[in-house]
Amino acid sequence: MSLKKIIDVKSVNTLLKKGIINKEGVRIIDCSFAVAPRPDWKEFEQEGYGDFKNLMAEPSPSRNLYLAGHIPEAVHVDLDIATYPSRYQRFQQYRADLFEEYAQMVGLNNKEHFIFYGKGAFGGMLFASKVAWIFKSYGHENISLVDGGFDSWKRNGFEVSTELVKLPAGNFKAEDNFKKYVITFQELEAKKDGEDKQFIEKTSEINFLDSRIRGQFDGTQETGLDPHLVNGTRIAGFKNLPSAELLVKGGNLKSEEEIKSWLTQNGYVENQPTITSCNAGIQAALLAYVIDAVKPSQNPPRVYNGSLKEMELRAPKKISEGPQHLPH
């Protein structure tokens, strides 16, 4: 089935009423996520890494959010199970062969179209876009993101379920498509033979987009960065395109033309490679998803999953622009 990359709740409701969800190659995926402190990565590595059966059996605040009310027929994908805490990243992606085990346990299949939605911040699209981008990086291209998320669904008066939806095990096969959709710290630091600049320093040739709110970028609001490690608020040469500004009041996305105009006004250059970042790779995924939807390209944006929280641990001097507070 051919569906747009961004879909409205009325279209989702039509699919539901026609009995298409979970029956005719379309799955709807609830991405409700309860933000929690970063788990101890060493402990998780020993006791939880890839143990999806036990992870899915444990109490889950995110699952509780899902069970409190969701779109009928929607299954839940938990970002804290789909990813794992590593030394440098809050949401590190598993190897493809491990991730597919989780996707199969949820009940997802290769040839299906996945519709992602969420609750809360950024019109419910913050964590939903992250999960959607994760699936893209594992080779699944048939995806849609629900504009306005669950709040929009409820505002329209559509049916809400509290049932735990369980599907038969799926046949989802994950591919390592990371090079197309995500970028690593090592790639950012790399230099090509004969070149003086690292990839991350080519800011005139590449759209390096910081998707945090302007106050964090400028240092007028708390950045979430460690002031003992970092003497700045942003990476030199990065442009600020806050994901929050993609939305109108009420939580829906701006029109496609408004988004295109906003991208240009904020320094986005057409046909340049694009890298998105934030603090932990979440807002960056929303910006990347929307750019990919309104400006489809053979070279889509790539998300820096580790973002500034990884950079402050591995190369803190890269975060050098903005207000300074440490002695030189």
Swiss-Prot record:
EC number: 2.8.1.1
Residue stretches making up the Rhodanese domain: 22-162, 202-320
Enzyme kind, highest EC tier: transferase
Protein name per UniProt: Putative thiosulfate sulfurtransferase mpst-1
Keyword terms, alphabetized: Repeat, Transferase
One term under GO cellular component: mitochondrion
Catalysed conversion reaction: thiosulfate + hydrogen cyanide = thiocyanate + sulfite + 2 H(+)
Active site feature: 278 (cysteine persulfide intermediate)
PROSITE patterns cross-referenced by the UniProt entry: RHODANESE_3
CDD domains: TST_Repeat_1
Source organism (scientific name): Caenorhabditis elegans
